Curated annotation (Swiss-Prot):
Organism: Saccharomyces cerevisiae (strain ATCC 204508 / S288c)
Stated name of the protein: Meiotic recombination protein REC114
Binding partners and assembly: Interacts with MEI4, MER2 and REC104. Component of the MER2-MEI4-REC114 complex.
Major subcellular location class: nucleus
Assigned keywords, A-Z: Chromosome, DNA recombination, Meiosis, Nucleus
Length: 428
C-alpha cells in the first residue's frame, strides 16, 4: 500500500441523506437541501488521503483525529467516471460517488474546504493524474464564464484562463489561481437552485379539481378543513375551507307486530288448521290444529307472543285452547256454534243472560262457570278457557294498527254488532 496523496483539510461537510440512483449519475435526482448538510471543522484534525493498493485498487479516506474514518471509498484503478466524480472551485473540492454497500445503488456526497490554494492545486493535480473526472463548479448562471488572471511562479508572466462547462486541465502544480467572488459553499449553490425552482413553480396555477377537500362531520360546529399538497422541492400549499356538518337524518324502521303463526302438534297428528272466532278478545281469530281421535293437545302461547300482544292491544291475555276429539262433522258443529253466538249478540232478549261474560272467570271443561253449573251440549267439542285479562293495562295502540283494523271487514262487522247490542242495552 502506497500513500499517493495526503493533505490536511480545514472543513469537512457531508450530505446526510443519500439519493436513490438506479441509473448512476444519469438518474433523475432531487437537488440537495441546505439543511441536510453536516459540517465538521472546529477542535479536530481532518485529513484527506489517497492510497494505492497492490491489487490495482484506489482507497480514498477522510480521517478524523488520525483514527476515525469518515469516508472510506474503494475503487478500481483506471476508468472511474461512472463511479466517482469531483467538482473543484478553490478552495473547495466536492465529491459524489455511487455506493452499493447496502444493496441498491445510492449516490452520496461530501465536500472539503482546503486551507489554501497551494494545497488545493496539489490535490487537484493528484486526482487528475489518477484519471478521475474533475469538473469546474459553477456558482451562478452569471458567472458561468469567468476570466481569471493566472500568475506563474517561475517566470512571473500572466496567463489568461477561461472557465467553461468543459473539464478543466491542471498541468502546472505551482500555478496559483487568483479569483474574485468565486469562493462559495456548494450547499449555498444548491439552495439558490432550489429557491429558483420554487419561484418558477409558484407561478403555475393548479386546477381546483386536483385539490381534494377532506370533510369531517361533527355535531353543531363549523370546521376549518385543511387540505395540503406538497410537490417535489416546492413549499407546502395549504387551503382552508369553511364547512358545515351535514344534518343526520334518522328514519325509524317499522317492526312487524304480528305474532308468528306457529303451532306444535304430536308427530303422528295431521297438519290441518281451522279458524275459530271468539268474542272474549280483540283478536277474533285463532289458529288451532286438528288432532286425531284419542289425543289431547294444549296450545300454549309463548311469552314472546304475549309481550307482542300486550304492546299492540294493551291487554294481558293468556288464552289456553283445549281441543277435544270429535267426529268427521266437527267443522259443521263449529259453524253452528258460531251462528248461535252471533244470534245471542244480535238478540239479547232470546239469550238467557244479556250481560257479557267476565273475562276473569274460567270456563271449565265440564261446563261450570264460577261454581254455577251449566250443562254443556254433547255436540260441542270445543271449550275455551280464558284467564288473566287485565282491562286496566295501559293501551298502546299505534296508527298502523288502527288502519289495519279499519280495513278488516270481519272486525268492523263485529264492532257493529257490539255497538247495536250496547245501544239496545242503554235503551232499556
Amino acid at each position: 500500500m502506497y500513500e499517493y496523496c495526503s493533505v490536511v483539510i480545514k472543513k469537512y461537510s457531508k450530505y446526510t441523506i443519500p439519493s436513490f440512483a438506479p441509473n448512476g449519475f444519469q438518474s433523475m435526482l432531487e437537488p440537495p437541501q441546505i439543511d441536510k448538510w453536516q459540517h465538521l471543522s472546529a477542535n479536530c484534525t481532518l485529513q484527506f488521503r489517497v492510497l494505492l493498493m497492490d491489487s490495482r485498487q484506489i482507497l480514498i479516506n477522510v480521517v478524523l483525529n488520525n483514527s476515525t474514518l469518515l469516508e472510506n471509498i474503494r475503487l478500481p484503478l483506471g476508468d472511474n467516471q461512472d463511479l466517482i466524480q469531483f467538482s473543484c472551485k478553490s478552495p473547495i473540492i466536492s465529491c459524489k460517488y455511487i455506493s452499493e454497500e447496502f444493496g441498491p445503488r445510492m449516490l452520496r456526497r461530501f465536500q472539503m474546504n482546503l486551507p489554501n490554494d497551494v494545497e488545493f492545486n496539489r490535490t487537484v493535480v493528484s486526482l487528475k493524474n489518477l484519471n478521475f473526472v474533475l469538473r469546474t463548479a459553477r456558482t451562478s448562471i452569471a458567472q458561468s464564464t469567468i476570466t481569471s488572471q493566472v500568475q506563474g511562479n517561475n517566470n512571473g508572466t500572466k496567463v489568461c484562463f477561461t472557465e467553461g462547462p468543459k473539464v478543466s486541465s491542471y498541468t502546472n502544480p505551482n500555478t496559483q489561481f487568483q479569483t474574485q467572488n468565486m469562493i462559495m459553499d456548494f450547499s449555498q449553490r444548491y439552495q439558490e437552485e432550489s429557491e429558483r425552482e420554487s419561484n418558477n413553480r409558484s407561478n403555475i396555477t393548479l386546477p381546483h379539481d386536483s385539490i381534494q377537500i377532506a370533510q369531517q362531520i361533527w355535531p353543531n360546529t363549523d370546521l376549518n378543513v385543511v387540505q395540503s399538497s406538497q410537490d417535489l422541492n416546492t413549499p407546502m400549499a395549504t387551503q382552508t375551507v369553511l364547512g358545515r356538518p351535514e344534518s343526520l337524518i334518522v328514519q325509524p324502521l317499522e317492526v312487524s307486530q304480528s305474532p308468528p303463526n306457529t303451532t306444535n302438534c304430536l308427530p303422528n297428528a295431521e297438519n290441518k288448521k281451522k279458524k275459530v272466532d271468539t268474542t272474549s278478545d280483540f283478536t277474533s281469530r285463532k289458529e288451532i290444529a286438528l288432532c286425531k281421535t284419542g289425543l289431547l293437545e294444549t296450545i300454549h302461547i309463548p311469552k314472546e307472543r304475549e309481550s307482542q300482544m300486550q304492546s299492540v292491544t294493551g291487554l294481558d291475555a293468556t288464552p289456553t285452547i283445549i281441543w277435544s276429539p270429535g267426529k268427521d262433522n266437527t267443522a259443521k258443529k263449529n259453524t253452528s256454534n258460531k251462528k248461535n253466538i252471533d244470534d245471542k249478540l244480535t238478540n239479547p232478549q232470546k239469550s238467557g243472560n244479556t250481560h257479557t261474560p267476565d273475562r276473569n272467570k274460567e270456563v271449565l271443561p265440564n261446563g261450570t262457570l264460577n261454581e254455577t253449573r251449566k250443562e254443556a251440549s254433547p255436540s260441542e267439542g270445543l271449550t275455551i278457557r280464558v284467564k288473566n285479562v287485565n282491562r286496566n293495562a295501559s293501551r298502546k295502540i299505534s296508527k298502523r294498527l288502527i288502519k289495519e283494523k279499519l280495513k278488516d271487514e270481519e272486525f268492523m262487522k263485529w264492532v257493529n254488532k257490539v255497538e247495536t247490542v250496547l245501544n239496545k242495552m242503554f235503551e232499556k
